[in-house]
Design a protein with these regions (language model features):
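Active-site neighborhoods and metal-handling regions in enzymes and metal-associated proteins
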Residues: 1-222
Length: 222
């Protein structure tokens, strides 16, 4: 069931999202070669707590950290580790959220570690723009799959693929609510978008096949 949010609820969620966004901006100047993915997670958690909010991800479904930190071919849900050391040329995705007054936020960003290849830079740039292409359709008057259609069309027109198995979603008191928001699909299909719906739009773009598998830790997707 899609839960429509009131203006008061959306205002609370906006505060949570502002904190998450600020943390993701701050990470850009923090990440460097030689750093562990655990250090990134520690930075994220300390910042969330500084704002008197709760790390949305920590403990969710048993996830052990405040942030998913996924490196290179890891698509999502990377578990931070003291043993995983970033090196020059890596790209790293940090996915996190802050909970405020019982309402969740959820956002991700991908970063370059030092100097990266032109191909890796293009992947980051196309993924970012595909998000904004989808957001153009997150408005009353459009339908849900217009969002995914725009993401897919932009990514594929630039020579990249779109992950099928992992999706965006509604968000509110629960991190994952209805509806699921795929990053692909046919335009003019799916539920009509209504005022008060809150969506996490999460393009996952790949240089290779869109097929995925889960590693032995039961979390990390490659």
């Amino acid at each position: 069931m899609i839960i429509i949010k009131s203006k008061r609820e959306i205002d609370i969620m906006r505060e949570a999202a502002k904190v998450t966004g600020e943390i993701l901006r701050d990470i850009e100047g923090f990440i460097k070669p030689g750093m562990t993915t655990h250090a990134i997670d520690n930075f994220v958690e300390e910042r969330i707590l500084h704002y008197k909010m709760k790390p949305t991800f920590k403990g969710y479904g048993g996830f052990p950290a405040a942030a998913c930190v996924s490196v290179n071919d890891e698509v999502v849900h990377g578990i931070p580790s003291r043993d995983r050391v970033l090196k020059e040329g890596d790209i790293v995705s940090v996915d996190t959220g802050s909970t405020y007054k019982g309402y969740c936020s959820d956002a991700a960003r991908t970063y370059a570690v030092g100097e990266i290849s032109d191909e890796a830079r293009k992947l980051i740039d196309v993924t970012k723009q595909s998000f904004f292409e989808g957001v153009k359709y997150a408005m009353v008057g459009y339908r849900l799959h217009d969002i995914g259609h725009a993401v897919q069309e932009y990514a594929e027109s630039n020579g990249f693929g779109v992950i099928r198995e992992y999706l965006g979603h509604g968000i509110g008191r629960d991190l994952h609510e209805d509806p699921q928001v795929p990053n692909y699909g046919d335009a003019h299909t799916g539920p009509h978008l209504k005022e008060g719906m809150v969506l996490a739009i999460e393009p996952m773009i790949t240089q290779g096949s869109y097929g995925t598998r889960v590693l032995g830790n039961d979390w990390t997707v490659v």
